[in-house]
A protein has these predicted regions:
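Signature of uroporphyrinogen-III synthase
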Residues: 1-201
């Protein structure tokens, strides 16, 4: 069975592993970066969420990290997701009134959603994201007259990789989820594997 190397945080690799298995591949996960919940931010999230008229969810990780700390029973609150994966994550958490761009999965696509026109003037929008996310959406919403609050509910930490049992010859292909992970991976690649990883790019 061919092996697909998946480079992403281990908590996000489950769907990719299932996809590989269904396609007849065996998955091998390397996680040079891991996701850590920000416990301080999560303790204050319930209050932030309760006073918001709308919540914007930046990623499935944001949803899965924050959802246990909020109450989705208020169907009147608009839930806005950056893309289809985040929208599905919200629906799995029983969120209602979810708006998702049909094309695109970035802040620009989100800003084109009609849901913004349904919110009251000076509506309070909570952006739920990881630490250090883009400020483009927040600034754009402020220009539209919305009051924006940000909850940074997780952060990324470097993770030391174990190369002891790594078999480069068994890898048939690789999926690397982001540029950040490329940089984190290559910062740790041992000299004996550097040519192999360069050949994947």
């Amino acid at each position: 069975m061919p092996v697909m190397l998946i480079v992403r945080p281990s908590a996000r690799a489950g769907d990719d592993m299932r996809t590989c298995s269904q396609a007849g591949w065996r998955a091998r996960v390397l996680s040079p970066v891991e996701i850590e919940p920000d416990e301080t931010a999560l303790r204050g999230l319930k209050e932030q969420f309760s006073r918001a008229d709308a919540a914007f969810w930046v990623s499935p990780t944001a949803v899965e990290t924050a959802a246990p700390y909020v109450d989705f029973s208020d169907d009147l609150k608009a839930q806005i997701a950056v893309g289809q994966a985040s929208g599905r994550a919200l629906e799995r958490c029983s969120a209602k009134n979810v708006s998702v761009p049909q094309e695109g999965n970035d802040s620009e696509a989100v800003l084109r959603l009609p849901v913004w026109d349904t919110l009251p003037p000076n509506a309070r929008v909570l952006i739920v994201r990881g630490r250090g996310g883009r400020d483009f959406l927040a600034e754009s919403l402020k220009k539209k007259g919305f009051a924006v609050e940000i909850a940074e509910v997780y952060f990324r930490r470097p993770n030391e990789l174990n190369w002891q049992d790594f078999d480069a010859e068994s890898i048939g292909a690789a999926f690397i989820a982001s540029g950040e992970l490329v940089r984190g991976l290559f910062a740790q690649v041992p000299p004996q594997f550097s040519r192999f990883f360069e050949s994947l790019l």
